[in-house]
Amino acid sequence: GEYDILFKELEVLEAKHPELITPDSPTRRVGSEPQTGFGTIQHRLPMLSLSNAMNNDELIAFDERMKKGLGTNIDIVYISEPKIDGLGVELVYEHGTYISGSTRGDGFIGEDITQNLRTIRSLPIKLRGEVIPTLLEVRGEVFIKKDDFATLNKTQEREEKPIFANARNAAAGSLRQLDSRITASRPLSI
């Protein structure tokens, strides 16, 4: 899509002008040496599974629970989108710079997958904008698009490796690799 076109343009630009390459460029995310195991990260606020809201009353009840949990009465702005079946993650930015990422885990403590998340090209390492918060915690899903999943399984089959049962398991397994170079080779989106 559009991202892929822009990524190619960036690769061409960096090839012509290496002086423009920055350490946080998406073209530089290739993974690092294997880890010996994952550490843990405690979530500042519990990372709970979201329930479906089927009507306005359920949305209002959700808003009331969020305000109570945050200890505030101010209006909260929500962004909603269709459900994506992937692995729930939390990203932490300090002064606009990505510093850590973790799985949901048990909702209170997750696995530290900072390095593996860093390999996802669409994940911004440095936030841009005029107003950057001191601390920003972002929660979302890492997933593999349907077409990318089909291509991944064809590659697995061609290389005589086991194919993945479904895209969610492929995404989760990719993020939990001790060798982030494997993660970097997978078509993950966030």
Which residues does each predicted region cover?
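RNA/tRNA-interacting regions in translation and RNA-turnover enzymes
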Residues: 1-190
